[in-house]
């Protein structure tokens, strides 16, 4: 996933934006907690949104955060395919 730096001027953290399998991904660094977290949105009729902080998931490195984001999206898509087959 390619990330674009969208950090605002004078911000104490870092903010990046990217896309993965039609999901909009935001990878953020919090200087207060010295950790990375992500939030995603599907921007389509599925209206899927998720923030890793809801489950208290924080990452030590940006790479780990990106990997966690991609794994979450892959899991959502896999579950959607299974439910389509059953329904």
Model-identified regions with their sequence ranges:
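Mixed-charge, Lys/Arg-enriched low-complexity segments
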Residues: 2-7, 44-87
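Short N-terminal "domain-start" leader segments
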Residues: 1-40
């Amino acid at each position: 996933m390619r990330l674009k730096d969208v950090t605002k001027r004078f911000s104490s953290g870092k903010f990046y934006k990217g896309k993965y399998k039609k999901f909009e991904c935001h990878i953020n660094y919090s200087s207060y907690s010295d950790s990375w977290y992500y939030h995603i949105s599907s921007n389509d009729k599925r209206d899927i949104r998720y923030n890793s902080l809801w489950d208290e998931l924080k990452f030590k490195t940006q790479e780990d955060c990106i990997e966690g984001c991609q794994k979450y999206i892959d899991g959502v898509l896999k579950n959607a395919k299974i439910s389509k087959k059953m329904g």
